[in-house]
Design a protein with these regions (language model features):
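Exported/extracytosolic protein signature
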Residues: 1-195
Length: 195
């Protein structure tokens, strides 16, 4: 409750004049203690204004109005990405650490979680640098992963991702294999494999 004594700027407003009040709040956690997720969360605001109208012509009277607003809370949609030689569904080959002129393969794994709202038409995209080769192996094969060689772009068409994915049910995951052929200029460096 804001009263005129606490907000002198709103104590008296001339016709057409505006005032402003700011406040902060925190929402409840979207994940409950039992690990269930609050789906399609919203915050409903009802703001009630009350004041006295003072006019030389019309005298005084009470003016009241209410405004109701709803704020929809976005989903937390996160991607975790790893590149590994030893872990994942593929057997990798090549020297470790990598050596100039010899290809070393890695498994790139992506994992998606989604908190509180269903997401439609989700897509994850990444680019392979010129020194990284797409090998064409994807697991599971049912996931829609494609590679555009002209752009060096890997694309994962997830489509619909339900609320709670990765929190109340298993994360959505996919892995693909790449080959890295280091050059002399990369000796002693840690080259980026996927961006």
């Amino acid at each position: 409750v804001w009263r005129r004594g606490a907000l002198p700027a709103l104590e008296r407003l001339a016709p057409g004049e505006r005032g402003q009040v700011s406040f902060n709040f925190a929402s409840r956690p979207l994940i409950r203690s039992d690990r269930s997720v609050i789906t399609r969360p919203t915050i409903d605001f009802t703001v009630h204004f009350r004041g006295r109208h003072i006019s030389a012509d019309a005298g005084s009277g009470v003016i009241e109005t209410s405004v109701i607003k709803q704020v929809k809370i976005n989903s937390v949609f996160q991607l975790a990405a790893t590149a590994s030689y030893h872990d994942g569904p593929f057997t990798n080959r090549g020297p470790l650490p990598p050596e100039v002129g010899e290809e070393t393969t890695y498994t790139v794994s992506w994992s998606v979680i989604n908190s509180s709202n269903d997401v439609a038409n989700a897509t994850v995209r990444a680019t392979l640098p010129a020194y990284v080769r797409w090998l064409g192996f994807v697991s599971p094969e049912s996931e829609k992963v494609s590679f555009d060689s002209s752009r060096g772009e890997v694309s994962w068409q997830l489509g619909a991702v339900d609320a709670g994915r990765g929190l109340t049910s298993a994360a959505r995951e996919v892995s693909f294999q790449i080959g890295f052929l280091p050059s002399v200029s990369q000796v002693g460096e840690s080259p980026v494999l996927v961006t």
